[in-house]
Every structure is written in structure tokens, then in C-alpha cells.
């Protein structure tokens, strides 16, 4: 009986241990699930904002019937795409055709790992955070090229080639701008870059220390997002819908999601690298330093930091949406000339000047 009792206690202890492991596993993925929910809500808000701002610019009525103020219009459109038939090209490469959208979405979602939304509210505070983002974002054009090649359609193939060429042309100036920011901050961690801008308040932001780099980064980010006037890979008048021509249903919805996710990531990185992240514009004196630090105060500080970060990001979103409905589309040769003959030399010169100033200050 003693042996049986010991065995029962051992089994119970193991079952409790397994239960604790399951609970710990659920708790560990809770931040990721929260971030995914936040990203989904942000994308819906961006879609609604773009439609409202576009309607205001064009002096017309935007979405107003689906929910109050048309807030549910994006959900209605997404539901419609999910319920549509997923048509596959009869002579296309089906495996590549199916993998292409997934690669583009996953590569952009991984970029959120290194974005600090609030005070130390980041999933992975890595010492190479900004360069990890550049490496991950370089994978997305591969998915677009695969989508264009596998569709067995000349318009899709040309759209995929344009997407790859455009990404290569503007990835290099963008990288040089990030290098200059890393030199100024003495770190490649996104959290360290934000904290380095908090010392002098509004005038400590990198937008004042790197005005040329900011303009180059802004233009390169718009080109990476393939937004007007840089939407050559999916120009309707020339390529029908570019690499998206043969897609329908949920796969087309994924490409639609990619464009807005890319815009959101670019907006957040403009905020983190140049606009001080979660910091206010006043010299850094934390209001919460006057209170005893506890969980409630920490959560409140983090929440306010997230609000400040998103407010700054929406400024870039407003600029990009306004540019879309203001400037005409560029030709392909003009787009490549802008990237290779103007932005690349300017960003390289900015990097050399930053390096020289840092060496002199040593």
C-alpha cells in the first residue's frame, strides 16, 4: 500500500508539472497574441483612415453605411475576400503560387518583433534590431517575385520583376540612413536608439540631427511600400494588377494586407528612428518618477508610451496617404534614376559626414 501511495503521489506531481508547463506556454504566447490583435486592429483603422482621407481630398462621401461612420467597411471587404473562390492558374506553378503571399506576409509580421511600441514594450530587444528588420524586409520581394513568376502571366511576371528591381534600388539608401542613425546612437538596438533621443527632448530627435537622412528614409520607405507615386509593380494602366493579376480570394487578400502592414511598419520605424519613439517633446522628466513604481504605474506609463508612438506614426500615415492622391505615378526609368543616381549618393554622403563628425567628437 505504501508503494502504491508513493506511485500515486509521483503521478500527481508529474501531472501538476505538465499542467504548469501548459499554463506557462499559454502565458508565454500571450504577448504575441496581443500584438497580433493590435496589428489587426491597426490595419483596419488604417484602411478606414485612408478611405476617409481620400474621400475628403476628392470631395466625395467615403464609407458610411457599414457600421457607424463606415468603421466596419474594412471588415466587410475582408469577409467578402475570405468567402470568394480561390482560383488557381491552370498552367502556373501552383506550389510557388501558393507560397508567395505567405512569404510576403510572414516577413513583414516578423518585423514587429524589434519595434518598441512603448517604454521597453518590445518582444525582442536585440543588439542588431534595426539590421534584423532590414534583413527580414528584404525577404518580402522574393515572395512577390515568386508570385509573378508562378502565375504564368506576362503582366504578373513584369510586376514581379519591377517589385524586385524597386526593392533593390531603395533598400541600399535606406540601409545607409539606418547606419547613420546607429552611429549617432552608438547602438543598433531600437530601444537604445529611442532612449538616445530622450536626453534633449524635442530637439534631441534625430530628425533635426539627420534632416537629409530623414528625407531619404521617407522617400525610400514609400518606395518600399509600393505606394503612389512608386506603385510601378502594380500599375493598373500598364500591368492590370501586376503580380496580383491571377490572384483571388484569400491570397489576394493577403497581398492587400501586405501593403498596409508594410505601411504600418515603415511608419513605426520612422517614429522610432527619427521622431523619438515613445518620448514626449519636452525634456525628459518622467511624470511617473514622482510616484512609487509599481505594476499599475508601469502599465500606465507603457500605455501612454504606446499612445505617443502611434500618434507619431499616424502623422507619417497621413503624409503617405496625402502623397498618394496628390502626385502622379513615375515612369520606371525615373524611379530607378531617383534611387541610383540621387538617393544612393546622397545617403552615402550623409553616412560619410556622420562618420566624420563622430570621429571628430571622440
UniProtKB/Swiss-Prot annotation:
Family affiliation: Belongs to the complex I subunit 1 family.
- Reaction catalysed by this enzyme: a plastoquinone + NADH + (n+1) H(+)(in) = a plastoquinol + NAD(+) + n H(+)(out); a plastoquinone + NADPH + (n+1) H(+)(in) = a plastoquinol + NADP(+) + n H(+)(out)
Recorded hits in InterPro entries, A to Z, give: NADH_UbQ_OxRdtase_su1/FPO (IPR001694), NADH_UbQ_OxRdtase_su1_CS (IPR018086)
Name the keywords, alphabetized: Chloroplast, Membrane, NAD, NADP, Plastid, Plastoquinone, Quinone, Thylakoid, Translocase, Transmembrane, Transmembrane helix
Kindly indicate whether the keyword Plastid belongs to this entry: yes
Pfam families for the chain: NADHdh
Q: What name goes with this protein? A: NAD(P)H-quinone oxidoreductase subunit 1, chloroplastic
Query: What is its EC class?
Result: translocase
The enzyme's E.C. designation? 7.1.1.-
Q: Which GO terms describe its molecular function?
A: NADH dehydrogenase activity; oxidoreductase activity, acting on NAD(P)H, quinone or similar compound as acceptor; quinone binding
- Lineage of the native species? Eukaryota, Viridiplantae, Streptophyta, Embryophyta, Tracheophyta
A Gene Ontology cellular component where this protein is annotated is:
chloroplast thylakoid membrane
Instruction: Specify the protein's topology with respect to the membrane.
Output: Multi-pass membrane protein
Localisation: Plastid, Chloroplast thylakoid membrane
Transmembrane intervals: 29-49, 103-123, 128-148, 164-184, 202-222, 247-267, 303-323, 335-355
How does the record describe its quaternary structure? NDH is composed of at least 16 different subunits, 5 of which are encoded in the nucleus.
Task: Write down the species.
Answer: Agrostis stolonifera (Creeping bentgrass)
Q: What does this protein do?
A: NDH shuttles electrons from NAD(P)H:plastoquinone, via FMN and iron-sulfur (Fe-S) centers, to quinones in the photosynthetic chain and possibly in a chloroplast respiratory chain. The immediate electron acceptor for the enzyme in this species is believed to be plastoquinone. Couples the redox reaction to proton translocation, and thus conserves the redox energy in a proton gradient.
One biological process term from GO is: aerobic respiration
Amino acid at each position: 500500500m505504501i508503494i502504491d501511495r508513493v506511485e500515486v503521489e509521483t503521478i500527481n506531481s508529474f501531472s501538476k508539472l505538465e499542467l504548469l508547463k501548459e499554463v506557462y506556454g499559454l502565458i508565454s504566447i500571450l504577448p504575441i497574441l496581443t500584438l497580433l490583435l493590435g496589428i489587426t486592429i491597426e490595419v483596419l483603422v488604417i484602411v478606414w483612415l485612408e478611405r476617409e482621407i481620400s474621400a475628403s481630398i476628392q470631395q466625395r462621401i467615403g464609407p458610411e453605411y457599414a457600421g457607424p461612420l463606415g468603421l466596419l467597411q474594412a471588415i466587410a471587404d475582408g469577409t467578402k475576400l475570405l468567402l470568394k473562390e480561390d482560383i488557381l492558374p491552370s498552367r502556373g506553378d501552383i506550389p510557388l503560387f501558393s507560397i508567395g503571399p505567405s512569404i510576403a506576409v510572414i516577413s513583414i509580421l516578423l518585423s514587429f518583433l524589434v519595434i518598441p511600441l512603448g517604454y521597453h514594450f518590445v518582444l525582442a530587444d536585440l543588439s542588431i534590431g534595426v539590421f534584423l528588420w532590414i534583413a527580414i524586409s528584404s525577404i518580402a520581394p522574393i515572395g512577390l517575385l515568386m508570385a509573378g513568376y508562378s502565375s504564368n502571366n506576362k503582366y504578373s511576371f513584369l510586376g514581379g520583376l519591377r517589385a524586385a528591381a524597386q526593392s533593390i534600388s531603395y533598400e541600399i539608401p535606406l540601409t545607409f540612413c539606418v547606419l547613420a542613425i546607429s552611429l549617432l546612437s552608438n547602438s543598433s538596438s531600437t530601444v537604445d536608439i529611442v532612449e538616445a533621443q530622450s536626453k534633449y527632448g524635442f530637439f534631441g530627435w534625430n530628425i533635426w540631427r539627420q534632416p537629409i537622412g530623414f528625407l531619404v528614409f521617407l522617400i525610400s520607405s514609400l518606395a518600399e511600400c509600393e505606394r503612389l507615386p512608386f506603385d510601378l509593380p502594380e500599375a493598373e494602366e500598364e500591368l492590370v494588377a501586376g503580380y496580383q493579376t491571377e490572384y483571388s480570394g484569400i491570397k489576394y487578400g493577403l497581398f492587400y494586407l501586405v501593403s498596409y502592414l508594410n505601411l504600418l511598419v515603415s511608419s513605426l520605424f520612422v517614429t522610432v528612428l527619427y521622431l523619438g519613439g515613445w518620448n514626449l517633446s519636452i525634456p525628459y522628466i518622467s511624470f511617473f518618477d514622482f510616484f512609487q513604481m509599481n505594476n499599475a504605474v508601469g502599465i500606465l506609463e507603457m500605455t501612454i508610451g504606446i499612445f505617443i508612438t502611434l500618434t507619431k506614426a499616424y502623422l507619417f500615415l497621413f503624409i503617405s496617404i496625402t502623397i498618394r492622391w496628390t502626385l502622379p505615378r513615375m515612369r520606371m526609368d525615373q524611379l530607378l534614376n531617383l534611387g541610383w543616381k540621387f538617393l544612393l549618393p546622397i545617403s552615402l554622403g550623409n553616412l560619410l559626414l556622420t562618420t566624420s563628425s563622430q570621429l571628430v567628437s571622440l
